[in-house]
Amino acid sequence: MSWVLHIAFQIQVEHPVSELISGVDLIREQILVAAGEALSVAQEDILFRGHAIECRINAEDPIRGFLPCPGTITHLHLPGGNGVRIDTAIYEGYQIPPNYDSMLVKVITYDRDRKTAIRKMIRALDEMEIEGVRTNLEFQYDILHQKDFQEGNFTTDFISTHYEL
């Protein structure tokens, strides 16, 4: 019998959520360790505070089975403000090829509790404008308005039980 062990040395995609609730810059810590330095914070000193939510805005069409939507971004307005973090590399004129990772923008909001973080995310998505390609922006916005989502009553079956796609 053979065994294969896979070790991935990358940070999780959701690391901004962990960073916001812990106050620890995980990328900085990863670089320090890679450079042979010690971590700047001890595990027992990390305290979790508040609530963070991440929405991934993708160039895809939820109504058509989340098919990819390549094209050119013709207009872009990203939200901002206290407790709103935007991770992206897109810009007006950005070309999305057909063979790509569909994630365009990660929007992360942080506040004292889930309800307030959701409200902040709703405002952020309401302010966001991406034109030229189809995205899942409106779909994410709709999910945030679902009572079950707001109350934390969801599983990995949420989309299939709340939407006919």
Which residues are covered by each model-predicted region?
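ATP-dependent carboxylate activation and anion-phosphoryl transfer catalytic cores
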Residues: 1-165
